[in-house]
Regions:
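Mid-chain, well-packed structural core segment of small domains
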Residues: 76-83, 87
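Iron-sulfur cluster-binding cysteine motifs and their immediate structural context
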Residues: 17-38, 61-78, 92-109, 122-135
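Short, structured active-site "lid" loops
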Residues: 46-60
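Aromatic-flanked redox-active Cys/Sec active sites in thiol-based oxidoreductases
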Residues: 9, 83, 130
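Intrinsically disordered, low-complexity segments
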Residues: 37-42, 46
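Short Cys/His-rich zinc-binding micro-motifs
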Residues: 12, 56-57, 86-89, 115-119
């Protein structure tokens, strides 16, 4: 069984704590641009929140597209990026291959960004004050 995040966008308070803590884990400092989870919303009609993150899908389009085999699925079903194998620079096939738009390319950053479930204990779930995220 694939372990992945589950979201209830209706509970999201738009506090952005999940993105801040995720980026801290991913790159060492808090900047939502480097987060594996993205929050978007539509205003003004009705507040509609969308949370985008890697679903650890069974299809593994990103894995298949990587010319360096830098994306691998572990024994828990979590797709992880082996940074030492990732040699893509400007063109990142995994970003384009993801049907869910859940792998992100950040300018001037050497690796794609995606949710890797924080080694099985997602920090975003731990810090979410509204219970919008769970495993």
């Amino acid at each position: 069984m694939n372990k992945s995040l589950k979201a209830n966008p209706q509970n999201c308070s738009l506090c952005n704590l999940c993105a801040l803590v995720c980026s801290k884990v991913q790159v060492g400092y808090s900047d939502p641009a480097f987060s594996g989870i993205r929050i978007s919303h539509e205003l003004p009609a009705a507040l509609k929140v969308k949370l985008t993150y890697c679903l650890q899908c069974k299809q593994g389009y990103c894995i298949k597209s990587c010319p360096y085999q830098a994306l691998v699925r572990d024994e828990q079903g979590i797709v992880r990026l082996a940074r030492d194998k990732c040699h893509c620079t400007e063109i990142r096939p995994c970003v384009e291959a993801c049907k869910f738009k859940a792998i992100y390319s950040v300018p001037l950053w050497q690796y794609p960004i995606k949710c890797d479930m924080c080694q099985g204990s997602p920090r975003c779930v731990q810090v979410c004050p509204s219970g919008a995220l769970r495993v």
